[in-house]
Amino acid sequence: MHKLIIHGGTPLKGIINISGAKNAVLPIMAASILTDKLHITNVPKLTDVSTMKDLLRSHGADIEIIEHQDEFELIIDTKNINNFTADYEIVRKMRASIWVLGPLLTKYGKAKVSLPGGCAIGARQVDLHIAVLKAMGAEIEIEDGYINASSKGRLKGTHFVFDKVSVGATINAILAAVLAEGETMLFNCGREPEIVDLCNCLITMGADIAGIGTSEITIKGKDSLNKASYKVLSDRIEAGTYMFAAAITKGDVKICRIDYHIVENIALKLIETGIKVVPINNGVQVTYEGKLNSVDLETNPYPGFATDLQAQFMSLMTLSSGVSMITENIFENRFMHVPELCRMGADIVVRGNKAVVRGVEMLKGAEVMASDLRASVSLILAGLSTNSKTVLHRIYHLDRGFQDLEKKLSNCGADIKRV
């Protein structure tokens, strides 16, 4: 099994280009089921993308892959979909597999999807997905670990209020509603840029969607959607990760191919800590200027601070000048990186959904183990900050969400290699 060896202590300096957003491309790929052909560009080279390709092919899709140096193009032809079951062997690898449920059900009137897998960071139940589809007229039962869904005729437009903000359920609801009969109004929706990107892609395909980027989305169902081409937006989580990498290594990095407005809340939090962050053409520049203040943080649905960046921010705060309180409001089990950071000398105490981080002068290298995607990269950031050697095990998580991570860091001076 591969591992990463990191020799820290070098400030990162240079340019990092951001890849396409994983959390946007996966639902957009699922949306291809709604039409006959979808051409997607700026597709990141990630194992989760490969898993979604395998899933779509298992349903009968034909996928042409055009490889470029930094991205894929995908041409997905779904006119011959003939299998409506998403098997456990594929779905267990990635929770995003559940996003084929809405498209299959709304277009073909039936779907059977295994209960999903992915990172072990909380329950992330499918109750809201099922509830909104039932509100559209679907008949759904869970049997033998599968969601069995069917509808008599087309799904029907509905008014639905999500009990809590759910990105995944918002996406499935939108994917189902675009071909439902009549008007669907969704309340308390996720507002994430990746949801906006999905909606913009669906509009390119001919969907009628209003309220994009707000908590209230209105969709007027169409009889069919068109072929289309669409470029996926860049990954704000990847961008934020490298912004924190620049800060924790006392570096100076230009992070390019990202719109500043979707990383502005990250930039503002870094500025609070004393890091210099300025917008530049096609990106943002992050520069350490000699101090790192302790700052409290709460994760919340967008436009709040992303839970997917909480672990990276915590790594940064382990070296801050005081005490910070980090509150995790999204997932109940997202502090699994804490014991590993403590192995490296961090002073962190977890109390329920809160972590108290007391800054130390320096972390030290150690052998550590990744528990999930975002935790793994937080340990890399910690390793880069030390003046010694860190060995990170179970790095297969990284390839699910970060394209060319070692290359991008090495190009900025990091000593990091996979063995």
UniProtKB/Swiss-Prot annotation:
Pfam families: EPSP_synthase. InterPro entries: Enolpyruvate_Tfrase_dom, Enolpyruvate_Tfrase_sf, MurA_subfamily, RNA3'P_cycl/enolpyr_Trfase_a/b, UDP_GlcNAc_COvinyl_MurA. The keyword Cell division applies. Keywords: Cell cycle, Cell division, Cell shape, Cell wall biogenesis/degradation, Cytoplasm, Peptidoglycan synthesis, Pyruvate, Transferase. Phosphoenolpyruvate binds at K22, N23. One of its GO terms (molecular function) is UDP-N-acetylglucosamine 1-carboxyvinyltransferase activity. It is an enzyme of class 2 (transferase). The keyword Cell wall biogenesis/degradation applies. Pathway: Cell wall biogenesis; peptidoglycan biosynthesis. It catalyses: phosphoenolpyruvate + UDP-N-acetyl-alpha-D-glucosamine = UDP-N-acetyl-3-O-(1-carboxyvinyl)-alpha-D-glucosamine + phosphate. CDD domains: UdpNAET (cd01555). This is UDP-N-acetylglucosamine 1-carboxyvinyltransferase.
